[in-house]
Amino acid sequence: MGNPARKTFRAKRDSRRAQTFKASLPGIVECPQCHEMKMAHRVCKNCGHYKGKEVVSVEE
């Protein structure tokens, strides 16, 4: 079996592994009620609607 020719340093090893653990962007969608950007599957912070119903009353 072959042996490593050179020591692999922590920085080189970790930067190589970084592509595996790269975080994906959160799902950001447009609210159908107020057309503001919001997280998917969450109540809109701007208008308080979720799935076409007003869940939270928002004071303006």
Swiss-Prot record:
Plastid in keyword set: no
GO MF annotation, one: structural constituent of ribosome
Record key words, sorted: Ribonucleoprotein, Ribosomal protein
Keyword presence, Ribosomal protein: yes
InterPro entries xref list: Ribosomal_bL32 (IPR002677), Ribosomal_bL32_bact (IPR044957), Ribosomal_zn-bd (IPR011332)
Gene expressing this chain: rpmF
Lineage, top ranks: Bacteria, Bacillati, Bacillota, Clostridia, Eubacteriales
HAMAP family the UniProt entry points to: Ribosomal_bL32 (MF_00340)
Species of origin: Clostridium perfringens (strain 13 / Type A)
Pfam families, sorted: Ribosomal_L32p
GO biological process: translation
Classification via SUPFAM superfamilies: Zn-binding ribosomal proteins
Classification via NCBIfam families: rpmF_bact (TIGR01031)
Name of this protein: Large ribosomal subunit protein bL32
Disulfide cysteine pairs (residue numbers): none
Family: Belongs to the bacterial ribosomal protein bL32 family.
GO cellular component: large ribosomal subunit
Top-level lineage group: Bacteria
